[in-house]
Amino acid sequence: PNPACKDYSEEYQALYHEHMAKMLEERPWIWSSHVWNMFDFGCAARDEGGVAGRNNKGLVTLDRKVKKDSYYIYQAYWNKQPMVHLCGKRYAQRAGETTEIRVYSNQPSVTLFLNGEKVEELSAEKVFVFTVALKDGFNILTAQAGEVKDTMTLEKVEKEPEIYVLPEVNERAE
């Protein structure tokens, strides 16, 4: 799906934080910053992203178990230890001829592998975007930057699950 404002997807949140982290980096006169919110939290008045009673804008889930992709963009900007992170692990079933693979890293270049075969090596600043043609069935993707790497499994499907599409507000109320 194409992430858009008010869809409350992890993908849209990551795009938003990519923009914010880059803005902070480009403005050296900003001597302090913080992120609102570190964790999702309960909020009775909220009905967002198909979940009632939760503000889901945190970088980590309400139960503190899952670091969302947006968490890792700040690591790419602020962490001194080499790191690489493949985005979209929870968007695991994908349809279409090609799919976009986003990688966050604080290294100058990242190499992407599909089922053990090199796809491409890119140089970028923090956000690396690859276009990949998945094979039918399950695919193992590995992003590597020097000694650090991250791996995920995606499945190429004919049609993406309905759960990937946020119902309209009036549809959720039925």
Tell me what each language-model feature is.
Residues 1-119, 123, 131-134, 140, ...:
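Extended substrate-binding grooves/exosites of carbohydrate-active enzymes
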Residues 126:
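Charged DNA-binding/catalytic regions of mobile-element recombinases
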Residues 152-173:
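Low-complexity, Pro/Ser/Thr- and charge-rich linker/hinge segments at domain boundaries
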